[in-house]
């Protein structure tokens, strides 16, 4: 039996418009040929940890087995709460990994997905992080030498700015809004506590991001491989980490990390 390939977060690049590829065992599979065509993704029932590769019966937090959830640096609490990061102190689940990924330059940014939110990412993850969120525009507002400091700025700004994306609103046709980003930057500058002001930037300009979407559905329904092991339909586009189908169903690839799948050739009906 073909066990298929484990899903991972989609690869994304930006050259005028976002280009997407699935990260599969045999290498990246470009998704542009599938847009406007029938697309079928079949779960094989196999699950494997995104960190250690071990086959398991259950996955946690976007693809980890339980032992890796509690020990892998990629699953540490500071991934979602950067203010708790200890990398700059030489500490963490894996100090070498922490040095490479967290004790390095980070940015604090504002992204626009229909509303403004504040976030943190490693400098080398710009603009990929914004693409993963489905942002149509984003603006860097601070640049710092390590993750924990970026987290402190984010926590302080969460008093006046949202820090989460409304995925349903994001999956609509959202026009870029530079005015909203610049107004939020002014609000952030006034709100940020004095000892963090030295890191604030006023000379950055917003970046626009366009997605490969033929048409946006008026209403979206999220589907999962646990409930629907064969996901098939006309692929109308991709935004964030979501595949958008003609009938309004949407599939979050990243949330299915570690799920093994097989994919039919372009235009093949289920």
Predicted features by range, described:
Residues 1-270:
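Non-catalytic accessory segments flanking enzymatic or RNA/DNA-binding domains
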